[in-house]
């Protein structure tokens, strides 16, 4: 009864108004799984390939009809009749069918949509919530959210070079309370920004995008909001940064245009270290460019015992690259983005490899999202302990937070919120 009997790929629209791929998988029992894939703005050069049509007469070339056609033809032919419960076999079939290192032929947006839809159909037929289908009886840890409240870089049109300034409710007693902490700080920050006569419009991920004096001014705004909301910085709510440093790395230097600085890897490490000494920053993502492995080594040696150093563009959810990073003692955490690799099986392998090495795994959205909330179930199902899924606005972000609230309710008394314990990679 778990046999796949129909597969439909279609073009839908993401949170930025761009096309993306959605897939329906129908099983013999009549059960259906549906999944839609996200899309990034700042992307690592080694990510799996997102197949776009390139037809400038439709959506300025961003259409995904080719990817949908792949689903409706050769992918459908390859997996029709297979057992939806055999996720690893199905994903291997997709990988082999594509035949490239980076899913350039079929498109990672096509393979991922199918992979996710199959899992959701199998979970539905099993009568299990998706997180339980992924993780079994051991899935009971809620993730600590990293909430992007000020946007810069590729996610905003302001003078901030760093891409994300996040609040992390490490002192909350539960996920539900962590959401309350975040929402109250978000609304307080909105009032502070408004009172300064600055715009309170939000960026792609729901955070504010004010033009302020410099990066430290943005950090101080957030600290002010935390305190005015009645919380203690560092103890109850810590800070995180996503530098997205590849975006401003040119000719071997880091060009912070908003600061009027051009820095070497060592100098940028020193700047980040100074901020970590002055402010309660416990996580820095992509603190060096993806190809600056010497810079990553410098950063890890300097800060790796006291700050979570997350590789996003660095590792692109790829076990081959992660393995090399672990061997070279680069970073101490990996960001997990399902569309960077293109199947659930490969995603779970990256999470498991990170955990075995003592690295943390942070489940993440993309800047272009949909109402699909699968990453919430992945976070709990894999006991990944941390999630990045935007600010406290935009329904495409709230879809994930609301799913996590439902999961915590479903778990009841066995639900656990790790707080600062989610950062087990810090000494």
Curated annotation (Swiss-Prot):
Q: What are the alphabetically sorted keywords of the record?
A: Cytoplasm, Glycolysis, Lyase, Magnesium, Metal-binding, Secreted
**What InterPro entries does the annotation carry?**
Enolase, Enolase-like_C_sf, Enolase-like_N, Enolase_C, Enolase_CS, Enolase_N
GO biological-process terms attached to the record: glycolytic process
Where found? Cytoplasm; Secreted; Cell surface
Q: How is the cofactor bound?
A: Binds a second Mg(2+) ion via substrate during catalysis.
Whether Metal-binding counts among this entry's keywords is yes
* Record-listed (2R)-2-phosphoglycerate binding positions: 163, 337, 366-367, 388
Look up the record and name the pathway of this protein.
Answer: Carbohydrate degradation; glycolysis; pyruvate from D-glyceraldehyde 3-phosphate: step 4/5
Report if keyword Cytoplasm is assigned.
yes
Task: Give the catalytic activity.
Answer: (2R)-2-phosphoglycerate = phosphoenolpyruvate + H2O
GO CC annotations, alphabetized: cell surface; extracellular region; phosphopyruvate hydratase complex
Q: Where does Mg(2+) bind?
A: 242, 285, 312
Its Enzyme Commission number(s) read 4.2.1.11
What is the uppermost EC class here?
Answer: lyase
Q: What does this protein do?
A: Catalyzes the reversible conversion of 2-phosphoglycerate (2-PG) into phosphoenolpyruvate (PEP). It is essential for the degradation of carbohydrates via glycolysis.
The entry sums up its family as follows: Belongs to the enolase family.
Recorded hits in NCBIfam families, A to Z, give: eno
- The protein here is known as Enolase
Q: Which organism is it from?
A: Janthinobacterium sp. (strain Marseille) (Minibacterium massiliensis)
């Amino acid at each position: 009864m778990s046999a796949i009997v129909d597969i439909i790929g279609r073009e839908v629209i993401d949170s930025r108004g761009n096309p993306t791929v959605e897939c329906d998988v129908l099983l013999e029992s009549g059960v259906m799984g549906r999944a839609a894939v996200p899309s990034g703005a700042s992307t690592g050069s080694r990510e799996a390939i997102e197949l776009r049509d390139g037809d400038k007469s439709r959506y300025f070339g961003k259409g995904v009809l080719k990817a949908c056609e792949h689903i409706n033809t050769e992918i459908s032919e390859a997996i029709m009749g297979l057992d939806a419960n055999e996720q690893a076999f199905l994903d291997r079939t997709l990988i082999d069918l594509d035949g490239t290192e980076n899913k350039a032929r079929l498109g990672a947006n096509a393979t991922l949509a199918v992979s996710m839809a199959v899992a959701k159909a199998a979970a539905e037929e099993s009568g299990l919530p998706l997180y339980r289908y992924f993780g079994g009886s051991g899935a009971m840890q809620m993730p600590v959210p990293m909430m992007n409240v000020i946007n810069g870089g590729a996610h905003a049109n302001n003078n901030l070079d760093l891409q994300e300034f996040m609040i992390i409710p490490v002192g909350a007693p539960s996920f539900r309370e962590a959401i309350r902490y975040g929402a109250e700080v978000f609304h307080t920050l909105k009032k502070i920004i408004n009172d300064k006569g600055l715009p309170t419009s939000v960026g792609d991920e729901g955070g504010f995008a004010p033009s302020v004096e410099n990066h430290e001014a943005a950090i101080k705004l957030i600290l002010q909001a935390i305190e005015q909301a009645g919380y203690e910085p560092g103890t109850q709510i810590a800070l995180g940064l996503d530098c997205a440093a590849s975006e401003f790395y040119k000719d071997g230097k880091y060009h912070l245009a908003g600061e009027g600085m051009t820095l070497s890897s060592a100098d940028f490490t020193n700047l980040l270290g100074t901020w970590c000494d002055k402010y309660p920053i416990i996580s820095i993502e992509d603190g060096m460019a993806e190809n600056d492995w010497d810079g990553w080594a410098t950063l890890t040696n300097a800060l790796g015992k006291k700050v979570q150093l997350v590789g996003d563009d660095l590792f692109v959810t790829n076990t081959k690259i992660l393995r090399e990073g672990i061997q070279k003692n680069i970073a101490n955490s990996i960001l997990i983005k399902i569309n960077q690799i293109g199947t659930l099986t490969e995603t779970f392998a990256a999470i498991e490899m990170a955990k075995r090495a003592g690295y943390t795994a942070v489940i993440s959205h993309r800047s272009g999202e949909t109402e699909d909330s699968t990453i919430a179930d992945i976070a709990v199902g894999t006991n990944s302990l941390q999630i990045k899924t935007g600010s406290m606005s935009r329904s495409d972000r709230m879809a994930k937070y609301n799913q996590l609230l439902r999961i915590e309710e479903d778990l009841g008394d066995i639900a656990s919120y790790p707080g600062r314990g989610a950062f087990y990679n810090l000494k």
